[in-house]
């Protein structure tokens, strides 16, 4: 994962840290040699008087060489340390970019059903956090590599004097490692178990202080309710976290105390050996320094290892997310989408219910959408109209029956090509905090640089009138999320969304409640243009307003997940069935 982010930086980081790892023991060994040389020179029977005499005598040449070597190593250590910090910051930034891009790409490949599943949302939330929260783990891994080499070099020096010193030091620190691993696992289990509550807590914090909800929070006085609910969840999490940390504090303090006793036992042995003359002052300096550094390094390694093991538990959430595979994908021998579509789209006894739901969203659904025809779907909320659109665009696959495009199952076609052939605008379209041009260009993002195409799509949707009023025109940032942004009315946003569908220039055009936020005149103009511009295309229109669907070639009445009746407006009114009943109910509001 790190290598994939930046091979060059990763290799440079490893080499720099390997060089830096052997510098401490080298400097300490040279320090020992300097002390021994000073003691030797001080014990000479005849010694030069002044510094210049020492220099001229040549007796201090070796000492001068040692001091110069130590100075060189000190300067090299400082320089390499700065290079390591520089490379580490760059590598971490590259890893953030690499992981974030990979997460976005993988999320785009997953099924819509995954995003509508609460369990998946918990996993996605944990994965998002790991792309940022665990990035320091890279630096810790590299530091562990460096410290491991340094420990090996110091350990080799201690073993040369007495192997038991290293063994004693390692045994003293093992209980600390075990204890740290235990508490890391406890904290991870707590965070994993409370992921749904954390998502709710973050959601409450977001809606309590965001522009989208600010009006209702103020008007309905929701601040106290949201604040108290947030505090309740946060305090619950805090209480459990505090209990675990209290236990960790007590246990780890005891284990660390035991390790300290072992350390000072070994230190007393070194002093005793020096007093008996078995070790020189230089040896004492080297051994005490090595033992002190080695104790700190091993303790740091064990702590870092336990910390990394704890963080690796969290990274497992990221890997699990990447392991998820979509159920909806292109077959190995995928067919190209016919150009043009000749016969149309047929629903044959289609049944579907959403994951985890007992009620069928659509059942025994059969109808034919002929090529070049405009069909309107009408019906009450929950009848299954939007589900039909999701099935048509293969956001879901039917559990029963099949959907045919020119006589072949939709599942036989290349998925990307199929979705490129269908332009859909849902009633809950996205309001992108981008420029007006980019809001339209998202309909066919590969043509983002084609400003003429964007202008043409805007004109078709009457969005050009909206954009003409903006100070910066097509380059104006829309939405209030960023400083330069200007918010739009619901109807203005809707025109931008409709322009997005025209930008796609797809063979099949689907508008799901496209004019819900438009006034009657604007709606009439949009549908007139839609009728004119959809000539030669296959179009599916969903609307609650019966005045809007009259222009369709055919109207299908959807109820309880199946087509109850179909025909032209006049035919359906004449039959005095469900369509006539709904039409009359709506018409009463205008009388």
Regions inferred by a protein language model and the residue ranges of each:
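Extended non-transmembrane interhelical loops and adjacent amphipathic helices
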Residues: 89-135, 197-240, 312-325, 455, ...
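Cytosolic ends of transmembrane helices, especially the final helix of ABC transmembrane type-1 domains
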Residues: 222, 246, 266, 287-323
């Amino acid at each position: 994962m790190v290598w994939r982010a930046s091979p060059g930086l990763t290799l440079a980081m490893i080499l720099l840290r390997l060089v830096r790892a052997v510098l401490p023991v080298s400097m300490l060994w040279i320090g020992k040699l300097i002390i021994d040389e000073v003691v030797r020179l001080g014990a000479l029977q005849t010694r030069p008087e002044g510094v210049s005499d020492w220099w001229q005598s040549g007796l201090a040449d070796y000492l001068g060489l040692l001091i110069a070597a130590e100075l060189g190593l000190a300067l090299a250590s400082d320089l390499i340390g700065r290079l390591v910090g520089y490379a580490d910051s760059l590598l971490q930034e590259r890893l953030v970019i690499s992981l974030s891009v990979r997460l976005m790409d993988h999320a785009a490949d997953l099924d819509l059903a995954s995003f509508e599943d609460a369990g998946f949302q918990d996993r996605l939330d944990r994965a998002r956090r790991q792309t940022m929260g665990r990035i320091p783990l890279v630096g810790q891994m590299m530091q562990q590599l460096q410290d491991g080499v340094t420990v090996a070099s110091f350990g080799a020096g201690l073993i040369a004097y007495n192997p038991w010193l290293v063994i004693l030091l390692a045994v003293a620190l093992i209980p600390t490692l075990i204890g740290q691993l235990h508490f890391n696992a406890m904290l991870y289990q707590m965070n994993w178990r409370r992921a749904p509550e954390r998502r709710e807590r973050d959601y409450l914090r977001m809606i309590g202080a965001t522009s989208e909800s600010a009006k209702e929070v103020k008007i309905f006085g929701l601040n106290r309710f949201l604040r108290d609910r947030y505090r309740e969840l946060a305090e619950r999490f805090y209480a459990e976290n505090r209990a675990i940390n209290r236990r960790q504090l007590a246990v780890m303090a005891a284990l660390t105390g035991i390790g300290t006793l072992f350390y000072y036992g070994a230190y007393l042995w070194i002093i005793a050996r020096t007093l008996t003359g078995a070790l020189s002052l230089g040896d004492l300096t080297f051994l005490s320094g090595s033992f002190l550094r080695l104790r700190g390094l091993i303790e740091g390694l064990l702590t870092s290892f336990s910390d990394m093991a704890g963080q690796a538990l969290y990274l497992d959430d990221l890997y699990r997310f990447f392991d998820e595979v979509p159920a909806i994908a292109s077959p190995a021998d995928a067919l190209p989408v016919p150009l043009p579509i000749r016969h149309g789209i047929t629903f044959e006894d289609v049944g579907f219910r959403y994951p985890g739901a007992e009620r069928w969203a659509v059942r025994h659904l059969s109808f034919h959408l002929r090529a070049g025809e405009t069909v309107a779907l009408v019906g009450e909320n929950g009848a299954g109209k939007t589900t039909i659109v999701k099935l048509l665009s293969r956001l879901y696959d039917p559990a029963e029956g099949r959907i045919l495009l020119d006589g072949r199952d939709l599942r036989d076609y290349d998925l990307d090509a199929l979705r490129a052939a269908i332009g859909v605008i849902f009633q809950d379209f996205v309001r992108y905090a981008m420029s007006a041009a980019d809001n339209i260009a998202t309909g066919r993002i590969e043509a983002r640089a084609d400003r003429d195409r964007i202008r043409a799509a805007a004109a078709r949707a009457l969005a050009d009138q909206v954009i003409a009023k903006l100070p910066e025109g097509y380059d104006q940032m829309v939405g209030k999320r960023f400083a330069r942004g200007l918010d739009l009315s619901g109807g203005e946003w809707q025109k931008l969304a409709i322009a997005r569908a025209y930008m796609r220039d797809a063979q099949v055009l689907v508008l799901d409640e496209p004019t819900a936020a438009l006034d009657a005149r604007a709606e009439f103009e949009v549908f007139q243009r839609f009728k004119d511009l959809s000539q030669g295309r296959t179009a599916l229109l969903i609307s609650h307003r019966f005045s809007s669907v009259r222009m369709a070639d055919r109207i299908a009445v959807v109820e309880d997940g199946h087509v109850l009746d179909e025909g032209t407006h006049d035919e359906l009114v004449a039959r005095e069935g469900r369509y006539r009943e709904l039409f009359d109910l709506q018409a009463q509001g205008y009388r």
